[in-house]
């Protein structure tokens, strides 16, 4: 009885995951295709990351010597855990490689690697976003915090839109990345006073 209940719940969640994927993926247009392909391309964000690192060094000054290793470490660890641990261990095919669903998908950006659980894009972006939300001083830089959080959400959404991940891949990746970002920011705040802008 317990086994049957667990199987029913698993089947329900799996079906829900697939239906959400199809609903998001099928709500496409040429304009959205361009936006999502752009958002999902890691290379185009490198200049933004460079500017962000430069700004963090300017804003935190000496404390950046602690902040940068922590935030870079959180993102790198998020990427390693999702890419080298979860994906090969669980071996869950990306939707675009899954013969049970890929014929129904709109794939404007082709298909990436074979496995998709968990999403590295989601884990990396939320590790960075959550770190900044916590490490930046409370009550300040609200616009930046909102932009960073929206960026992480858009990047994660784009992975489902493009058929590269199931929603659960993205949700799980966001949780892992968020926890790592929270942990790194907590360490930073413990060893550093809240940032005060230099005049």
Regions found by a protein language model. Name each.
Residues 106-199:
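Membrane-embedded catalytic cores of phosphoryl/pyrophosphoryl-handling enzymes
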Residues 1-49, 82-113:
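N-terminal transmembrane-helix/juxtamembrane module of multi-pass inner/ER membrane proteins
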Residues 37-41, 70-71, 173:
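Alpha-helical transmembrane segments of multi-pass integral membrane proteins
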Residues 42-46, 64-69, 142-145, 167-168:
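Short, aromatic-rich membrane-interface segments at the entry and exit
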Residues 27, 31, 59, 63, ...:
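Membrane-interface elements of multi-pass transporters and channels
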Residues 52, 77, 81-86, 180-188:
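Alpha-helical membrane-inserting segments
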Residues 53-82, 145:
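Interfacial segments of alpha-helical transmembrane regions
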Residues 40-60, 121-132:
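Hydrophobic alpha-helical transmembrane segments
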